[in-house]
Amino acid sequence: MKILFLNYIDESGAGKACLKIIESLKKKKIKCDYKVKIKIKNNNYSKTIDYKNPIKIENYKKKFNRIFSRLANKSIKSFQSPSLFGSNYYKFINNSDYDLVHLVWINGLLSIEDIGKINKPIVWTFADMWPFTGINHYDSDNNKAFWKKKIF
């Protein structure tokens, strides 16, 4: 079995947890690759994604996502990313020889639409609240449920 782990940055808490999983799997002789958009740690596991979008496009995406996040709901004060734009990275995944894709923290890496285009089995570790809120990474909620606030 060959597993692809996808994470935004290897320095985060999710990235550190991902590395522990990979180290455990490698001890069991399971082939794993760890692809990140931003590589900070000096290790033998994480490799930078070959991400071919021009810098200008990336900057426009970031600006649009920031503006959209501010306009979407001003009552939300936590870190947000709507991930409206994907990366076409799913094409690499679909054309690869990986048997399984493990998504970790994919902010800005894949959109929900991109995830739906992956034709490999997916395991998704919910390292934050984004997969089920659609925009927030974390919200302390202060004992008030999202659905009671009706902010979706």
Region spans (language model):
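Catalytic cores of nucleotide-sugar-dependent glycosyltransferases that transfer UDP/GDP/TDP-activated
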Residues: 1-152
